[in-house]
Design a protein with these regions (language model features):
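Nucleotide-sugar donor-binding patch of glycosyltransferase catalytic domains
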Residues: 51, 62
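Surface-exposed acidic, glycine/proline-enriched linker/cap segments
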Residues: 1-3
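Conserved catalytic-core motifs of eukaryotic protein kinase domains, centered on the activation segment
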Residues: 25, 59-61
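Left-handed beta-helix
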Residues: 5, 10-11, 16-17, 22-23, ...
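Multi-pass alpha-helical transporter architecture, strongest
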Residues: 54-56
Length: 62
């Protein structure tokens, strides 16, 4: 049994090649998901995330 929860992608989001965004995840505006990442939790706005599972690498906000 899979999950039918929607994936919500904000504005100006970059999802790089080979990334997987799991069901129920919300990706905030301006976020970047690095190549090959597996996103299992919500991504805050303007965060740069990467890895398996994806973790916050840095924030794009000044």
């Amino acid at each position: 049994g899979g999950t039918d929860a929607p994936i919500i992608i904000g504005d100006d989001v970059w999802i790089c090649y080979g990334s997987t965004v799991c069901a129920g995840v919300t990706v905030g505006d301006g976020a970047i998901i690095a190549a090959g990442s597996v996103v299992t939790k919500d991504v805050p706005p303007y965060a740069v995330v990467g890895g398996v599972p994806a973790k916050i690498i840095k924030s794009r906000q000044e």
